[in-house]
Protein backbone atom coordinates (compact mmCIF):
# COMPACT_ATOMS: atom_id res chain seq x y z
CA UNK A 1 0.00 0.00 0.00
CA UNK A 2 1.46 3.41 -0.91
CA UNK A 3 0.65 6.95 0.16
CA UNK A 4 1.44 9.56 -2.49
CA UNK A 5 1.96 13.25 -1.89
CA UNK A 6 2.59 15.60 -4.81
CA UNK A 7 4.80 18.59 -4.03
CA UNK A 8 5.94 21.36 -6.39
CA UNK A 9 9.53 20.97 -7.57
CA UNK A 10 11.46 20.58 -10.80
CA UNK A 11 14.54 18.48 -10.22
CA UNK A 12 15.30 14.96 -11.32
CA UNK A 13 14.55 12.56 -8.53
CA UNK A 14 16.24 9.88 -6.62
CA UNK A 15 15.33 6.74 -4.75
CA UNK A 16 16.24 6.58 -1.09
CA UNK A 17 16.10 3.31 0.81
CA UNK A 18 15.62 0.08 -1.12
CA UNK A 19 14.74 -2.33 1.67
CA UNK A 20 11.12 -3.45 1.85
CA UNK A 21 11.16 -2.66 5.55
CA UNK A 22 12.23 0.94 5.07
CA UNK A 23 11.02 4.33 3.97
CA UNK A 24 10.82 4.34 0.17
CA UNK A 25 10.86 7.61 -1.66
CA UNK A 26 10.88 7.95 -5.42
CA UNK A 27 11.26 11.38 -6.98
CA UNK A 28 10.93 11.91 -10.70
CA UNK A 29 10.15 14.46 -13.37
CA UNK A 30 6.40 14.51 -13.73
CA UNK A 31 5.54 17.77 -15.46
CA UNK A 32 6.28 20.30 -12.76
CA UNK A 33 5.42 17.98 -9.89
CA UNK A 34 7.32 15.63 -7.67
CA UNK A 35 5.88 12.35 -6.50
CA UNK A 36 6.87 11.13 -3.05
CA UNK A 37 5.96 7.60 -2.07
CA UNK A 38 5.97 5.64 1.15
CA UNK A 39 5.74 1.89 1.19
CA UNK A 40 4.29 0.24 4.24
CA UNK A 41 6.19 -2.62 5.86
CA UNK A 42 4.37 -5.80 4.92
CA UNK A 43 4.98 -7.53 8.24
CA UNK A 44 4.16 -4.49 10.35
CA UNK A 45 0.39 -5.03 10.74
CA UNK A 46 1.08 -8.40 12.39
CA UNK A 47 2.94 -6.72 15.28
CA UNK A 48 1.30 -4.74 18.08
CA UNK A 49 3.96 -2.03 17.69
CA UNK A 50 2.96 -1.12 14.14
CA UNK A 51 -0.15 0.02 12.34
CA UNK A 52 -3.15 2.08 13.37
CA UNK A 53 -3.77 0.09 16.56
CA UNK A 54 -0.22 0.42 17.89
CA UNK A 55 0.35 1.87 21.41
CA UNK A 56 0.16 5.67 21.46
CA UNK A 57 2.20 8.11 23.54
CA UNK A 58 -0.65 8.76 26.02
CA UNK A 59 -2.38 5.43 25.65
CA UNK A 60 -6.18 5.74 25.43
CA UNK A 61 -5.92 9.46 26.19
CA UNK A 62 -3.88 10.24 23.10
CA UNK A 63 -5.31 12.82 20.76
CA UNK A 64 -5.77 12.35 17.03
CA UNK A 65 -2.40 11.34 15.62
CA UNK A 66 -1.05 13.20 12.57
CA UNK A 67 -2.03 11.63 9.27
CA UNK A 68 1.61 11.21 8.24
CA UNK A 69 2.37 9.02 11.27
CA UNK A 70 0.84 5.80 10.05
CA UNK A 71 2.69 3.38 12.32
CA UNK A 72 4.79 1.84 9.59
CA UNK A 73 8.11 2.63 11.27
CA UNK A 74 9.49 1.39 14.62
CA UNK A 75 9.10 3.73 17.56
CA UNK A 76 6.14 5.64 16.09
CA UNK A 77 3.85 6.45 19.01
CA UNK A 78 1.90 9.09 17.13
CA UNK A 79 3.51 12.07 18.86
CA UNK A 80 4.81 14.97 16.79
CA UNK A 81 3.56 18.24 18.26
CA UNK A 82 6.38 20.17 16.55
CA UNK A 83 5.59 18.73 13.12
CA UNK A 84 9.14 17.46 12.61
CA UNK A 85 7.94 14.49 10.58
CA UNK A 86 5.52 16.33 8.31
CA UNK A 87 8.03 16.64 5.47
CA UNK A 88 8.92 13.16 4.12
CA UNK A 89 12.53 14.07 3.34
CA UNK A 90 13.10 15.60 6.78
CA UNK A 91 11.39 12.60 8.37
CA UNK A 92 13.66 10.14 6.57
CA UNK A 93 16.75 12.11 7.58
CA UNK A 94 15.66 12.42 11.22
CA UNK A 95 14.91 8.70 11.41
CA UNK A 96 18.41 7.91 10.25
CA UNK A 97 19.96 10.38 12.70
CA UNK A 98 17.91 9.04 15.60
CA UNK A 99 18.88 5.42 15.02
CA UNK A 100 22.58 6.30 14.66
CA UNK A 101 22.54 8.42 17.82
CA UNK A 102 20.65 5.68 19.66
CA UNK A 103 23.38 3.18 18.85
CA UNK A 104 26.14 5.58 19.92
CA UNK A 105 24.25 6.36 23.14
CA UNK A 106 23.85 2.68 24.00
CA UNK A 107 27.57 2.11 23.50
CA UNK A 108 28.38 5.29 25.40
CA UNK A 109 26.15 4.45 28.37
CA UNK A 110 27.78 1.04 28.65
CA UNK A 111 31.22 2.65 28.43
CA UNK A 112 30.34 5.08 31.21
CA UNK A 113 29.24 2.49 33.76
CA UNK A 114 31.23 -0.65 32.91
CA UNK A 115 34.72 0.62 33.84
CA UNK A 116 33.42 1.87 37.20
CA UNK A 117 31.81 -1.50 37.89
CA UNK A 118 35.02 -3.34 37.02
CA UNK A 119 37.08 -0.93 39.11
CA UNK A 120 34.88 -1.52 42.15
CA UNK A 121 35.40 -5.26 41.66
CA UNK A 122 39.19 -5.18 41.67
CA UNK A 123 40.11 -4.48 38.06
CA UNK A 124 42.84 -1.83 37.96
CA UNK A 125 42.26 1.27 35.86
CA UNK A 126 44.31 4.41 35.55
CA UNK A 127 41.00 6.25 35.76
CA UNK A 128 37.62 4.50 35.72
CA UNK A 129 35.39 7.59 35.70
CA UNK A 130 34.36 8.23 32.12
CA UNK A 131 34.87 12.01 31.94
CA UNK A 132 38.28 11.79 33.63
CA UNK A 133 39.67 8.85 31.69
CA UNK A 134 40.77 10.84 28.65
CA UNK A 135 43.00 13.11 30.72
CA UNK A 136 45.26 10.14 31.46
CA UNK A 137 46.80 10.55 28.03
CA UNK A 138 48.49 13.72 29.29
CA UNK A 139 50.05 11.93 32.26
CA UNK A 140 53.68 10.87 32.23
CA UNK A 141 52.93 7.23 31.51
CA UNK A 142 50.22 7.89 28.94
CA UNK A 143 46.94 6.02 28.66
CA UNK A 144 46.86 2.23 28.91
CA UNK A 145 43.80 0.28 27.84
CA UNK A 146 42.45 -1.63 30.87
CA UNK A 147 45.58 -0.52 32.72
CA UNK A 148 47.72 -2.88 30.63
CA UNK A 149 50.53 -1.24 28.57
CA UNK A 150 50.69 -4.35 26.37
CA UNK A 151 47.22 -3.73 24.92
CA UNK A 152 46.90 -0.11 23.78
CA UNK A 153 49.46 2.41 24.99
CA UNK A 154 48.51 5.93 23.91
CA UNK A 155 50.65 8.98 24.56
CA UNK A 156 49.65 11.39 21.78
CA UNK A 157 46.30 13.13 21.69
CA UNK A 158 46.93 14.04 18.05
CA UNK A 159 47.48 10.39 17.13
CA UNK A 160 44.26 9.39 18.88
CA UNK A 161 42.38 12.19 17.12
CA UNK A 162 43.80 11.20 13.73
CA UNK A 163 42.90 7.53 14.24
CA UNK A 164 39.35 8.43 15.17
CA UNK A 165 38.89 10.75 12.22
CA UNK A 166 40.32 8.28 9.73
CA UNK A 167 38.75 5.08 11.04
CA UNK A 168 35.36 6.47 12.02
CA UNK A 169 35.23 8.64 8.93
CA UNK A 170 35.96 5.64 6.72
CA UNK A 171 33.22 3.54 8.30
CA UNK A 172 30.66 6.35 8.17
CA UNK A 173 31.59 7.18 4.60
CA UNK A 174 31.24 3.53 3.66
CA UNK A 175 27.83 3.37 5.30
CA UNK A 176 26.52 6.47 3.54
CA UNK A 177 28.29 6.11 0.20
CA UNK A 178 28.07 2.36 -0.13
CA UNK A 179 30.70 -0.12 -1.23
CA UNK A 180 31.17 -3.74 -2.30
CA UNK A 181 29.77 -5.07 1.00
CA UNK A 182 27.06 -2.45 1.30
CA UNK A 183 25.92 -1.96 -2.27
CA UNK A 184 22.17 -2.14 -2.60
CA UNK A 185 21.64 -2.33 1.16
CA UNK A 186 19.74 0.02 3.40
CA UNK A 187 21.79 2.71 5.18
CA UNK A 188 20.08 2.20 8.54
CA UNK A 189 19.60 -1.56 8.57
CA UNK A 190 22.11 -2.89 6.02
CA UNK A 191 21.90 -6.60 6.82
CA UNK A 192 23.92 -8.90 4.61
CA UNK A 193 27.57 -8.97 5.68
CA UNK A 194 26.66 -6.57 8.49
CA UNK A 195 24.32 -9.15 10.03
CA UNK A 196 26.53 -12.22 10.61
CA UNK A 197 24.13 -13.59 13.25
CA UNK A 198 21.21 -13.53 10.85
CA UNK A 199 19.03 -11.44 13.16
CA UNK A 200 17.14 -10.00 10.20
CA UNK A 201 16.36 -13.31 8.52
CA UNK A 202 12.89 -13.52 10.05
CA UNK A 203 10.89 -10.39 9.09
CA UNK A 204 8.60 -10.64 12.12
CA UNK A 205 11.48 -10.99 14.59
CA UNK A 206 13.38 -8.22 12.81
CA UNK A 207 10.42 -5.85 13.13
CA UNK A 208 10.32 -6.51 16.88
CA UNK A 209 14.09 -6.00 17.19
CA UNK A 210 13.80 -2.61 15.51
CA UNK A 211 11.29 -1.51 18.14
CA UNK A 212 13.48 -2.80 20.98
CA UNK A 213 16.50 -1.02 19.53
CA UNK A 214 14.79 2.36 19.21
CA UNK A 215 13.21 2.14 22.69
CA UNK A 216 16.47 1.20 24.39
CA UNK A 217 18.34 3.76 22.31
CA UNK A 218 16.04 6.58 23.38
CA UNK A 219 16.46 5.52 27.00
CA UNK A 220 20.24 5.49 26.51
CA UNK A 221 20.21 9.03 25.11
CA UNK A 222 18.36 10.26 28.19
CA UNK A 223 20.83 8.30 30.34
CA UNK A 224 23.79 9.97 28.67
CA UNK A 225 22.21 13.37 29.25
CA UNK A 226 21.85 12.43 32.92
CA UNK A 227 25.50 11.36 33.07
CA UNK A 228 26.54 14.72 31.62
CA UNK A 229 24.53 16.62 34.21
CA UNK A 230 25.82 14.42 37.05
CA UNK A 231 29.41 15.00 35.98
CA UNK A 232 28.93 18.77 35.95
CA UNK A 233 27.03 18.95 39.24
CA UNK A 234 28.68 16.27 41.39
CA UNK A 235 32.03 15.66 39.69
CA UNK A 236 31.46 11.92 40.06
CA UNK A 237 30.68 9.00 37.81
CA UNK A 238 27.23 7.37 37.57
CA UNK A 239 28.09 4.32 39.69
CA UNK A 240 29.56 6.42 42.49
CA UNK A 241 26.52 8.69 42.37
CA UNK A 242 24.24 5.67 42.59
CA UNK A 243 26.21 4.31 45.55
CA UNK A 244 25.99 7.67 47.33
CA UNK A 245 22.25 7.83 46.76
CA UNK A 246 21.69 4.32 48.09
CA UNK A 247 23.76 5.05 51.21
CA UNK A 248 22.03 8.38 51.91
CA UNK A 249 19.05 9.03 49.62
CA UNK A 250 17.97 12.16 51.52
CA UNK A 251 21.27 14.01 51.09
CA UNK A 252 22.10 12.64 47.64
CA UNK A 253 19.31 13.22 45.16
CA UNK A 254 18.45 15.53 42.29
CA UNK A 255 16.47 17.96 44.45
CA UNK A 256 19.22 18.32 47.04
CA UNK A 257 21.82 19.10 44.39
CA UNK A 258 19.51 21.41 42.43
CA UNK A 259 18.86 23.60 45.46
CA UNK A 260 22.53 23.80 46.43
CA UNK A 261 24.24 23.89 43.05
CA UNK A 262 26.13 27.06 42.17
CA UNK A 263 27.68 27.00 38.66
CA UNK A 264 31.44 27.40 38.69
CA UNK A 265 31.88 26.38 42.34
From Swiss-Prot:
Annotated residues for binding of chlorophyll a 6: 245, 254
Posttranslational mods: Photoregulated by reversible phosphorylation of its threonine residues.
Binding-site positions, chlorophyll a 1: 79, 85, 98, 218
UniProt lineage: Eukaryota, Viridiplantae, Streptophyta, Embryophyta, Tracheophyta
Residues holding chlorophyll b 3: 156, 172
Keywords assigned: Acetylation, Chlorophyll, Chloroplast, Chromophore, Magnesium, Membrane, Metal-binding, Phosphoprotein, Photosynthesis, Photosystem I, Photosystem II, Plastid, Thylakoid, Transit peptide, Transmembrane, Transmembrane helix
Chain sites annotated for binding chlorophyll b 4: 164, 175
Annotated positions binding chlorophyll a 5: 212, 230
GO MF assignments: chlorophyll binding; metal ion binding
Organism: Solanum lycopersicum
Positions with a binding annotation for chlorophyll b 5: 164, 261
UniProt record similarity statement: Belongs to the light-harvesting chlorophyll a/b-binding (LHC) protein family.
Subunit structure comment from the entry: The LHC complex consists of chlorophyll a-b binding proteins.
Gene behind the chain: CAB4
Positions contributing to chlorophyll a 2 binding: 101
Stretches that traverse the bilayer: 99-119, 151-171, 219-239
Gene3D superfamilies: Chlorophyll a/b binding protein domain (1.10.3460.10)
Presequence boundaries: 1-37
InterPro entries on file: Chloro_AB-bd_pln, Chloroa_b-bind
Binding site for chlorophyll b 2: 103, 152, 181
Location of Phosphothreonine modifications: 40
Localization terms from the record: Plastid, Chloroplast thylakoid membrane
GO terms classed as biological process: photosynthesis, light harvesting in photosystem I; response to light stimulus
Cofactor note: Binds at least 14 chlorophylls (8 Chl-a and 6 Chl-b) and carotenoids such as lutein and neoxanthin.
The name this protein goes by in its record: Chlorophyll a-b binding protein 4, chloroplastic
